[in-house]
Regions:
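Intrinsic disorder in cytosolic terminal tails and internal cytosolic loops
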Residues: 1-12, 194-198, 446-468
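12-transmembrane solute porter fold
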Residues: 13-29, 34-36, 55, 67-68, ...
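Structural signature of transmembrane alpha-helices in multi-pass secondary transporters
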Residues: 27, 55-58, 62, 89, ...
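Extracellular/periplasmic helix-loop-helix junction of adjacent transmembrane segments
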Residues: 37-63
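MFS 12-TM fold signature
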Residues: 62, 86-96, 112, 177-181, ...
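Helix-loop-helix hairpins in multi-pass membrane proteins, especially solute transporters
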Residues: 70-203
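Hydrophobic transmembrane-helix bundles of small-molecule transporters
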Residues: 163-268, 274, 279
């Protein structure tokens, strides 16, 4: 049967598709649920002074898990790394569920970050190697939906579990999902073969990943020290410690928006960071500035998640209809719509709630278009033996950039308040920073060459080609 007439849930792909969706849902639910239960964790474990490290440790460990495993996959395939990543993530869940003090909890978050970063990189690789180009838009749309659904339900469900029983059951509850995911995914993962290539040495890449982690950690610590002089000094040192390894770990030209793969990664990292950070500050603006309840704020944010889910499904059908010829324009359109949505959020302190909901719906449509399509385009430009590295780059763009941008946004609020500005004014400045990022993302999206987006031979299922 031709791939044009197959579904991601046809017998050939059913087990792998369900396994991928469950893996993404488990990681997404765990990450978003911790946001809700973190105050309870810190209170019960007498660790309020270490509250921020519940999140920072996860991010820093995720950097290592994401970047290191990509090169391992390109040498050995994704089956073994996926197995070890699952075990690390499960160990982190068990350690968190049984943690007796805050230091054990922080250690468990490190294990979870390592496992989650490696797992998602393996999932992206499986998508590249298993699905033909004609189905990648659909599976990446399902991937996005599997992550968005926890954002709609995860915080509420986690809060309910914590209120009725204990926050520890949130971690225990994810384990069965991971077991089912492993049973469905691993047989398909073991069949995947990669063409071994040369490239950067694993040892060098590992050291660069560690340097990036240390630089990012110092940068995040420095942000919490602002506006003191030490905060600026450490922040500058941390920034240098981030930029130097980034130049080695990412495709050459990513930081300067070079045409092709570098522009794809820059576009994706910037628009996803702007979206994720805006959502965080939107909730703060709605509750503390507009005075609505947390549940009402959650519904407004959920409107973006809902439109994301819908358009992520629809874009897969569009991709099949035009055989991928409209991918470039869909990315540009998606980022442009996201810019409109963020611009509306910029005026949240003064616009009506109905307008805020409309802005969220528009932003959801934008991210629902740009996110899955940028992944499809990235894989279409990946040469044989490079699926693992491309997967690591995509996962890196989805996790590292938002984490850093959220930290910068938080420091903007701190500096503005230290300067005597109101919370409302500080939020406007932070949203302005997000608008700047999305404008740069629009510029980068125009540098994704339409000629490079079509595969040279779309009938070669699952084998991407290098486009010169």
């Amino acid at each position: 049967m031709s791939s044009n007439h197959q579904s991601i849930f046809s017998p050939r792909y059913f087990a792998l598709s369900i396994g991928i969706i469950l893996s993404v849902m488990a990681v997404g639910f765990e990450g978003l649920s911790v946001t809700t239960i973190a105050p309870s964790i810190a209170g019960d474990l007498n660790g309020l002074s270490l509250f921020g490290w519940i999140f920072s440790t996860y991010l820093l460990a995720q950097i290592i898990g994401t970047l290191v495993v990509g090169r391992i996959i390109d040498k050995r395939g994704p089956a073994a790394p996926f197995t070890y990543a699952l075990l690390l993530f499960i160990a982190g869940l068990v350690a968190a569920a049984t943690a007796g003090d805050m230091y054990i909890m922080i250690g468990s978050r490190a294990l979870q970050g390592l496992g989650a970063g490696a797992m998602m990189t393996c999932v992206y690789t499986a998508i590249s190697l298993s699905y033909p180009d004609e189905l990648r838009a659909k599976i990446l749309g399902a991937f996005g939906t599997a992550y968005v659904l926890p954002s709609m339900l995860g915080p509420y469900v986690a809060g309910l579990i914590a209120d009725q029983w204990s926050w520890r059951f949130v971690f225990w509850g994810i384990l069965p999902v991971l077991v089912v995911s492993a049973v469905l995914s691993l047989p398909a993962f073991r069949k995947l073969k990669v063409q071994q290539t040369g490239g950067a040495s694993g040892s060098s890449s590992t050291w660069m990943a560690l340097l990036l982690t240390m630089g990012t950690g110092l940068f995040l610590i420095a942000l919490s020290m602002l506006p003191s002089m030490m905060g600026f000094v450490f922040g500058l040192i941390g920034l240098v410690g981030m930029i130097l390894p980034l130049r080695q770990l990412l495709p050459k030209g990513t930081l300067t928006l070079r045409r092709g793969m570098p522009a794809i990664l820059a576009t994706r990292g910037l628009f996803f960071a702007a979206y994720a950070s805006t959502q965080n500050f939107l909730v703060l603006a709605l509750i503390d500035v507009r005075g609505i309840t947390p549940s009402q704020a959650g519904l407004i944010v959920a409107s973006a998640a809902l439109s994301w889910c819908i358009i992520a499904y629809v874009q897969g059908r569009w991709d099949a209809a035009d055989q991928g010829r409209g991918r470039h324009m869909r990315i540009i359109l998606g980022v442009f719509l996201l810019a409109i949505g963020i611009a509306i959020v910029f005026w949240i302190p003064v616009v009506s709630i109905a307008v805020a909901v409309m802005g969220q719906i528009i932003a959801g449509v934008g991210i629902g278009l740009a996110h899955p399509v940028s992944g499809v385009v990235a894989f279409s430009q990946t040469g044989e033996g490079g699926a693992g590295q491309t997967s690591a780059n995509l996962q890196f763009a989805d996790s590292f950039t938002p984490g850093v941008v959220i930290g910068i946004g938080g420091s903007i609020l701190v500096v503005c308040q230290a300067a005597g500005m109101s919370l409302q004014s500080g939020l406007i400045v932070a949203m302005g920073f997000h608008l700047l990022l999305i404008v740069i993302s629009i510029i980068a999206s125009t540098r994704i060459s339409p000629q490079s987006i079509k595969n040279a031979d779309p009938k070669k299922e699952g084998v991407p080609v290098i486009v010169q």
